[in-house]
Amino acid sequence: MVQKKTCTVVCALAAACALVLGVVAMGAAVTLTFEFTDLDPHAGQTMFLRVVDAATFVEVARLRVPEIPAGAFQIDVSPLETGTSYQVDYFIDANGNGAYDAPPTDEARRFFLSDVQASGAINVVHDATLTDIDWPPAIDGVVTTGEYRHAMTDPGTGISVFWQNDATVLRIGLISPGTGWVGIGFGPVDLMQGADILIAAVSDGVLTIQDQFGVAQTVHRLDSQGNIIQAAGTEADGVTMVEFSLFLASGDPADNALVPGQTVGVILALHANSDSFTSRHTARSTTAITLDGGI
């Protein structure tokens, strides 16, 4: 696996906020300035922050602070959209291991911005309230060591599968030993029949991904409802990496509803060098993954 280049900014984080902003037209791009104080006890520690569209679950920003500075500081987050509500998660890496650990090992908090209406400043209040935010992998097309809670490599195809879920969303990473398309299907009944299939390819730096379903043993078709929340992919040195997120239960009759803690049958396939989704696989296999439960 390759190491991901992380955008480094000076930013700050909090557990609550107050928003006093004017009203502008819906859908306009805005910038929010987070203004932070009272973080001196954490000076020198690392913070991670992400901003998520509360309605669609699309992550719109993810930032890393390598060292929290002493004194007051601020960060601009943009572009956000008017008329949109956001969930803001952050944690302070108190034990310095570079990864998220549930409180009280790390300090983690969550707050919401409801119906953002304009650019403006947010007064962030740092308090002692902690929340297990279950920090998820970044859907950026690069799978890094330890990014996902679970990982396996399928011996039949050579595809490495990475996964992590919360109560609502499943996040998947795939590393394929080829430059063609790669696919994964959940819940097959007979070969491809009944499977909820995601197939993706990266060509000239552009990811193409489709939500399909298996209608027969060897036939799959495009789903009329695309239920992928977010996706990204990269290709380098003869290897294709794809990451995506989707709802465990989308409500789409062509999707298989998944349940936390469930062991799910999985089909895997790839083409060694063709990005055409009509090209027959050069390798395929079946396996199973067990989703996170108790969440």
Placement of each model-derived feature along the sequence:
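Bacterial N-terminal signal peptides
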Residues: 11-23
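Short, acidic Ser/Thr/Gly-rich low-complexity loop/linker segments typical of extracellular
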Residues: 55-74
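Short Pro-Gly-centered beta-turn/loop motif in secreted/extracellular proteins
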Residues: 74-87
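Short strand-edge motifs at loop-to-beta-strand transitions and within beta-strands
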Residues: 71-75, 120, 240-242
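Beta-strand signatures of extracellular beta-sandwich domains
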Residues: 48-52, 87-91, 183-185
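Structural motif
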Residues: 33-44
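Extracellular-facing/secreted segment signature in eukaryotic proteins
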Residues: 136-295
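Structured interaction patches on ligand/partner-binding surfaces of diverse proteins
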Residues: 94-131
